[in-house]
Amino acid sequence: MTNVLISAAGLCGATIIGAILGFFVKELPHKWKDAVLGYCAGIMLAASTLGLIVPAFEQTGLWWLVVIGVMAGALFLNVLDLVTPHLHHITGLDPEEHRNNARLSHVMLFVMAIALHKLPEGMAAGVSVCSAEGATEWGVSFGIALQNIPEGMVIIAPLMMAGVSATRTFFISIFIALLEVAGILLGFGLGSASSTFLPVMLGFAGGAMLYVTSDEMIPETHAHGFQKQATYALLLGFITFVLMEKCV
């Protein structure tokens, strides 16, 4: 349980650190924003495949259980995509002002996409703590924490530029960080239920992260004409996770 609390504190703290740094970044060019998200996407791709799905196959002879877990994780995120709150409840602006601010609507949809994937990210870290392999356990947690810092910066700057108050923006970032903590506890609880269930949960967390990376993060990085920079940043993120897993 100590490892779970350490993982939760690390991931939550990394998101908040990124958010604080974001207050000092008044204007983040799309080129850098796409590169940062591409780097985060690379870490998530590596963490979901090398840190979760591959170990899941190695821990059981029932490969179909892992496949079911991967597909269930993707479907879970697909359903979450359909269940999003009214954006003006989050920003604190009245509905009319929100309708007239197309930039804010786009920013909030982007922030919601990041918030939604914090839950499966946390589940991935929580489930990996249940894994018998220490490298897998800390590799996934370190990888997610590393990408939480620039991701936190990416959340804060656009919100403030769109007119959301600094106080509300900071509380939004804290809420997003707490979603990840909830995911860690949920993932650890489900992964600890039985040794047979653990590979399914590893697959579930991996599938959810793959879905978010493909459906939300990569398309966002390719939407502003800087896809080459984002692609190389993704490769750098993937390599970072591989090297980090070897060193942990």
PLM regions: where:
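Intrinsically disordered, metal-sensing/regulatory segments
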Residues: 1-248
